[in-house]
């Protein structure tokens, strides 16, 4: 048996429920693997962020989620928004997730965490940073 203690599963792919989401979460829980989830956000307003939170909440309602619900903020559609606008969007998502009894976090790449997002404006102070290895010849 692998020593996998948890997974973070994506919820959306190309605007719809990830086609592998239900199978992945069912297999993980059946094998005693703790589960968290994330959504790659396309939200450019607080209303859109709440809609994304509701999308996630509807998906996970029947599953035992024991790890965070992450809001992945790094899409180019959000790139020209101010730090205050981005914080308001993140806070809207996190408030909705927290109110439903889950633990929200922010997920972003290093550039976004260091230059685009101001964590001091966020209602949560925890982030999850992607760390990609440098692979010669690969564009990332």
Regions inferred by a protein language model and the residue ranges of each:
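Second-shell loop/turn segments in exported
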Residues: 11-15, 39-46, 76-85
